[in-house]
Amino acid sequence: MADWTRAQSSGAVEEIVDRENKRMADSLASKVTRLKSLALDIDRDTEDQNRYLDGMDSDFTSVTGLLTGSVKRFSTVARSGRDTRKLLCGMAVVLIVAFFILSYLFSRTRT
């Protein structure tokens, strides 16, 4: 009779252990699914950011081209002669004064 009771209790223990294993396997599967979803979200976000950076690269390239051309033209004007230098200095002074006047007017309109 003792052997039969032992067999019955070991069967109950096996059943409890089996249920616990199934519960833990389901929990693990849920965590793996969440991790997979996070990995896919990170992948999508990375692709979006790469596209954005590629767009910025082309924008910076075009701006660099524009600035290079402007600097070359400015250098040519600066080298061309004394009269041009006087004109260039006068234009610079006018632009600086206009900047200060506009900044003063904008600060007055904000308050």
UniProtKB/Swiss-Prot annotation:
The modification Phosphoserine is found at S9, S37. Widely expressed. Highest levels in heart, liver, skeletal muscle and kidney. Its main location: Golgi. Keywords: Coiled coil, Golgi apparatus, Membrane, Phosphoprotein, Protein transport, Transmembrane, Transmembrane helix, Transport. Residues 108-111 are vesicular. Vesicle SNARE required for targeting and fusion of retrograde transport vesicles with the Golgi complex. Required for the integrity of the Golgi complex. Residues 1-86 are cytoplasmic. GO terms for cellular component: cytosol; endosome; Golgi apparatus; Golgi membrane; Golgi stack; Golgi-associated vesicle; SNARE complex; trans-Golgi network. Component of a SNARE complex consisting of STX5, YKT6, GOSR1 and BET1L. Interacts with STX5. InterPro entries: BET1_SNARE (IPR039899), T_SNARE_dom (IPR000727). Residues 15-77 form the t-SNARE coiled-coil homology domain. GO terms for biological process: protein transport; regulation of retrograde vesicle-mediated transport, Golgi to ER; retrograde transport, endosome to Golgi. It is a single-pass type IV membrane protein. GO terms for molecular function: SNAP receptor activity. It is found in: Golgi apparatus membrane; Golgi apparatus, trans-Golgi network membrane. The keyword Nucleotidyltransferase does not apply. Gene3D superfamilies: 1.20.5.110. The chain crosses the membrane at residues 87-107. This is BET1-like protein.
